[in-house]
Amino acid sequence: MIEMRKSGDRGTANYGWLETYHSFSFGKYYDPDNVQFGPLRVLNEDFIKGGKGFDTHPHQNMEIVTYVLSGTLEHKDSTGGEGLIKAGELQRMSAGSGISHSEKNASETEDVHLMQIWFVPEKEGIEPGYEQKEVSKGSDFFNSVITKGGGENKMDINQDITVYVGDLSSGDSGSIEISEGRLGYLHNSMIGTIQVNDLKLEPGDGLKITGPETLAITAESDSRLILFDMAP
């Protein structure tokens, strides 16, 4: 089963320095039909103005993935981790027993466009952790970048999830399966337009998927996608 989540149906807010879109209930936005999907709790698409960002704030017992689509994000946390997350890079942070961090646009003039995703963890109270990875446009249609247990060129995560990203050029096509007993969520970032089976996804559209389903995807323009294959 596939259910469309239209970009225009998302929650949105504009604070001047931050323009944000919420696929699931977040902050002042509440949608009883979109509180959570499997372990996927938050999927925000953010545009942060130059020199601005989120001051130091705490998290606990949440797996947080940040995917920077354009610009550069500066990260600092209470474990001593700090660095720059550049366009095309992902960061995975396990909040576990507790972590505080800040995220700010590293540029004074250029906006940062990013997706931030929160997953409910499999185990609570673990030691906080942090990983970062550059995603190169390889031969695979989708790159598997995060999975439980990690692996070669993959980051670990405290949940039964695999995260795929697709950096597609116009005309690229391929397919991917969500198996029976699994859930999937595909988000088409606010960059390009894609076709998935008989559905046209405009920028910001998403799909809730209950397996088994095969997704045949064609990029109608240059596009950036993220897909989660999850336990229910």
Per-region residue spans from a language model:
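Short acidic-glycine-tyrosine-enriched beta hairpin
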Residues: 79-94, 137-139, 196-216
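Tight coil/turn sites that cap or link beta-strands
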Residues: 45, 50-51, 88, 96, ...
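Ligand-binding loop in jelly-roll beta-barrel domains
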Residues: 95-125, 210-232
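Generic beta-strand structural signal
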Residues: 63, 83, 89, 99-101, ...
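Glycine- and acidic-residue-biased ligand/ion/polar-headgroup-sensing regions
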Residues: 60-79, 87-90, 170-171, 176-198, ...
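Histidine-centered metal-chelating micro-motifs
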Residues: 53-55, 72-75, 91-92, 96-104, ...
